[in-house]
Amino acid sequence: MNNKHNLALAEQYDQKPLIKTSMLPEVGASQWHAFLTLGFSKTARGTVLKTSDHKGPLYVQKPFYPEGRDTAHIYLLHPPGGLVSGDRLTITANLAENTHVLITTPGAGRVYRARKDKTLQHQITQLNVAENSLMEWLPQETILYPNAHTRLENRIHLANNAKFIGWEITCFGLPANQEDFAQGHAEQGFEIRQNGRLKVRERLVIDDSSRTIFAAKAGLAGKPINGLMIAGPFDLTNASHSASHDELIDSLRKHCAQHNSVSGVSLVGEYIFVRSLHHDSEQVKQLFIQCWREIRPALINKESNEPRIWAT
């Protein structure tokens, strides 16, 4: 896949923002923008990182292949470690046909306190997955500092028979320092399109008008950590497959029941959702890893192989 092909893919999947842009100040021309665009192809050497274009302090190391050459493990690096006022990060991964890519991060992402002018801190992740390919998006948690003003968008575009497993773990405030997210503004969007059709749309807005959601039982139930895991699409047309999916969901629910958190599992259309609320982001991550170990072989018939960086 060459740069021209990457550009064509990006233009093909260009969508309007998940979140209305009128709600927060826009990024001005004087603010810092960084981007990373990755292109993956299938060759005789397996899944290879064919192109890597970037601007600013956002890049990746060479791929790792702990599972063999067909699956590339990618570590996404952002040396500043977080977003300050006016930052805009755009991460794009274009997967050509028959590729398998797992992307993770070496540490937590951070969105720091905004300046007094409350200029937007914005991150867009766009994952374009071609036919018969798999994208695993498994970053570490994102910490939203009190008084951050941020918009975080995840856009996933799946072609025919493409698969996705991903999660996001968000820490509101600094609970270890007894600092909650009493001030600030956060918007999160998670969207999956399958062959151009919208299949999943999740949206969360935290501002002064909705801050009661933190304490509400139907909201975050007093927990500062909010985790969401999504996997699919699963084939529900075959009766035997449906039975095995029921067994998978039952097993995932047992993991949630044994976990000291407010967690649950649901099947929405062709996608499995795992949600978790907790006081400890590491506990949510461990629950999601347990679920991933079962979801992965059920979805793609391949056992889990944890990125080595998770053990450091």
UniProtKB/Swiss-Prot annotation:
Pfam families with a match to the protein in the record: UreD (PF01774)
Assigned keywords, A-Z: Chaperone, Cytoplasm, Nickel insertion
Annotated compartments: Cytoplasm
InterPro entries associated with the record: UreD
Domain of life: Bacteria
GO cellular component: a single term: cytoplasm
Its biological purpose: Required for maturation of urease via the functional incorporation of the urease nickel metallocenter.
Quaternary structure, from the entry: UreD, UreF and UreG form a complex that acts as a GTP-hydrolysis-dependent molecular chaperone, activating the urease apoprotein by helping to assemble the nickel containing metallocenter of UreC. The UreE protein probably delivers the nickel.
GO MF annotation terms: nickel cation binding
Residues annotated as signal peptide: none
Family: Belongs to the UreD family.
Name the UniProt record assigns to this protein: Urease accessory protein UreD
